[in-house]
């Protein structure tokens, strides 16, 4: 065991010596290591290698995925726009068919209203014609009665006038013979005008 302890002490001593040398190297280097011109070729190599690795990762992995997502979104947008245009066209067609149906319904309602008015007018005209015929019949009947009454009145008046004229002639000329035909002609001429 003693040998092991000596070996460990020797290893610690070597490690301490290495740390001391590293500390001495750090103490002797001026400022930041990125700005040390002695390490520029090594830094440029790793910079180019890193940029190439980033370029490879971007061009082979990231950009194709981004491009596919953009293409998918563009396709979705295009499909949505096409669907929106189709819906807009369908809405315009529906509105046009609605307006056409509304215009047809209005025309049909107007036609039905006109037919109803015409039918009512025809029925009214039939009733008016019927009433006119009844009025004309009653008027003709009334005129016939009036003519009959007038004829009866004239006949009665003529008869009364003949009787009165005969009596007047007898009163003025007692014992004279009365000419009934002459009295009747005189009364008829006077009554008829």
UniProtKB/Swiss-Prot annotation:
Annotated GO CC locations: plasma membrane; proton-transporting ATP synthase complex
Membrane-traversing stretches: 44-64
Pfam families linked to this entry: ATP-synt_B (PF00430)
Membrane topology: Single-pass membrane protein
Entry's localization field: Cell inner membrane
GO MF term (any one): proton-transporting ATPase activity, rotational mechanism
Keyword terms, alphabetized: ATP synthesis, Cell inner membrane, Cell membrane, CF(0), Hydrogen ion transport, Ion transport, Membrane, Transmembrane, Transmembrane helix, Transport
Keyword Ribonucleoprotein carried by entry: no
Keyword Chloroplast found: no
Oligomeric and partner information: F-type ATPases have 2 components, F(1) - the catalytic core - and F(0) - the membrane proton channel. F(1) has five subunits: alpha(3), beta(3), gamma(1), delta(1), epsilon(1). F(0) has three main subunits: a(1), b(2) and c(10-14). The alpha and beta chains form an alternating ring which encloses part of the gamma chain. F(1) is attached to F(0) by a central stalk formed by the gamma and epsilon chains, while a peripheral stalk is formed by the delta and b chains.
Protein family membership: Belongs to the ATPase B chain family.
Role summary: F(1)F(0) ATP synthase produces ATP from ADP in the presence of a proton or sodium gradient. F-type ATPases consist of two structural domains, F(1) containing the extramembraneous catalytic core and F(0) containing the membrane proton channel, linked together by a central stalk and a peripheral stalk. During catalysis, ATP synthesis in the catalytic domain of F(1) is coupled via a rotary mechanism of the central stalk subunits to proton translocation.
Name of the protein in question: ATP synthase subunit b 2
Gene (UniProt): atpF2
């Amino acid at each position: 065991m003693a040998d092991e302890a000596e070996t460990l002490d020797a290893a610690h001593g070597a490690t301490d010596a290495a740390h001391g040398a590293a500390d001495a190297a750090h103490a002797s280097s001026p400022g930041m290591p990125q700005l040390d011109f002695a390490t520029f070729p090594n830094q440029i190599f790793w910079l180019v290698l890193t940029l190439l690795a980033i370029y490879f990762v971007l061009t082979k992995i990231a950009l194709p995925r981004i491009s596919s997502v953009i293409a998918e979104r563009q396709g979705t947008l295009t499909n949505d726009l096409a669907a929106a245009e189709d819906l807009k066209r369908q809405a315009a067609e529906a509105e046009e068919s609605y307006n056409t149906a509304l215009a047809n319904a209005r025309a049909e309602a107007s036609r039905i209203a006109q037919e109803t008015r015409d039918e009512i007018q025809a029925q009214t005209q039939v009733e008016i014609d019927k009433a006119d015929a009844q009025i004309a019949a009653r008027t003709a009947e009334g005129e016939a009665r009036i003519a009959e009454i007038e004829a009866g009145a004239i006949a009665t008046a003529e008869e009364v006038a003949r009787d009165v004229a005969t009596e007047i002639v007898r009163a003025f000329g007692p014992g004279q013979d009365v000419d009934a035909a002459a009295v009747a002609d005189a009364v008829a001429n006077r009554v008829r005008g």
